[in-house]
Amino acid sequence: MWPLWPLAALLALSQALPFEQKAFWDFTLDDGLPMLNDEEASGAETTSGIPDLDSLPPTYSAMCPFGCHCHLRVVQCSDLGLKAVPKEISPDTTLLDLQNNDISELRKDDFKGLQHLYALVLVNNKISKIHEKAFSPLRKLQKLYISKNHLVEIPPNLPSSLVELRIHDNRIRKVPKGVFSGLRNMNCIEMGGNPLENSGFEPGAFDGLKLNYLRISEAKLTGIPKDLPETLNELHLDHNKIQAIELEDLLRYSKLYRLGLGHNQIRMIENGSLSFLPTLRELHLDNNKLSRVPAGLPDLKLLQVVYLHTNNITKVGVNDFCPVGFGVKRAYYNGISLFNNPVPYWEVQPATFRCVTDRLAIQFGNYKK
């Protein structure tokens, strides 16, 4: 069993980058560029960290569900084979960990009295039913982790205080209009690993959201959704079935600085489609079916990282990455991956990478037919 005293501190420092669901400790780790903190990203006036413990009532140390570990307003009831949310949870609890159990339903009064709860972890249960008022008492909830369950829809009536929702690896096929209504503080949603198709997003499904981060990876998308929040800084659509990027696919997403499209079936990127991303810094197009370097990369003045490995690229032109002349690009590349492409790297002119910080930033070779 993990010691409990560091959990609250770690959760307060967590970054909203849920690339992969792991153990509880890994909820707090970040394997990429740092995100804006909750307050900066959402524009909310409320603080983004754990509530000031001095402002809360004293800890009711005698109240701890059987088999659980309770300390410093953290209640850890993971890996106990629980069939339901336990009773006798202290009302001053700020973090409730119920992952890796056999809970199948969240009932109306399961969280009654937990008005100070900041984070709720329900990962890897068997939840298929949630009462429409189950989350009503959680007026201060900011982080809800309910991945790896049996949900077929987004839970109704999510708390308006919510900042981060992780609901990947469920059975959700539809995102209806209004399901996120009133969630003005939300800045991060991880909903990959659901059998979502493009038609599953109703028009206006994300209306009102000012998201900073969205991941819909490992789904069934055949194109880039055109009605996502225009506030996005990060969009991850890797491991889908996207075949092309058309001219206006990215028109709405001018604030992106990281775009993940790896492990798709992209053969064509229409000329000019990348010009709508003036702040882009990192572009993942690895493991696709591209036959050439996408047009428009030299015009992205802030672009620093491009993943193009494992495609069908046979030629790299001298102006494919860098603009003509000096002083045009505001940030030099520090990573270009071209390995596992049928391009004869010995034929590539050295001037091709004149705007790269270091030759070690370029990855070539290792192509096998």
Curated annotation (Swiss-Prot):
Q: Which gene encodes it?
A: BGN
Q: In which tissues is it expressed?
A: Found in several connective tissues, especially in articular cartilages.
Query: What name does this protein carry?
Result: Biglycan
Question: What processes in GO biological process is this protein linked to?
Answer: articular cartilage development; bone development
Q: Which UniProt keywords apply?
A: Disulfide bond, Extracellular matrix, Glycoprotein, Leucine-rich repeat, Proteoglycan, Repeat, Secreted, Signal
Q: Which family does it belong to?
A: Belongs to the small leucine-rich proteoglycan (SLRP) family. SLRP class I subfamily.
Quote the SUPFAM superfamilies the UniProt record gives. Answer: L domain-like (SSF52058)
Q: Which residues are glycosylated?
A: S42, S48, S181, S199, N271, N312
Superkingdom, natural source: Eukaryota
Origin species = Bos taurus
Identify the stretches annotated as LRR repeats. 83-103, 104-127, 128-151, 152-172, 173-196, 197-221, 222-242, 243-266, 267-290, 291-313, 314-343, 344-369
Name the Gene3D superfamilies on file.
Ribonuclease Inhibitor
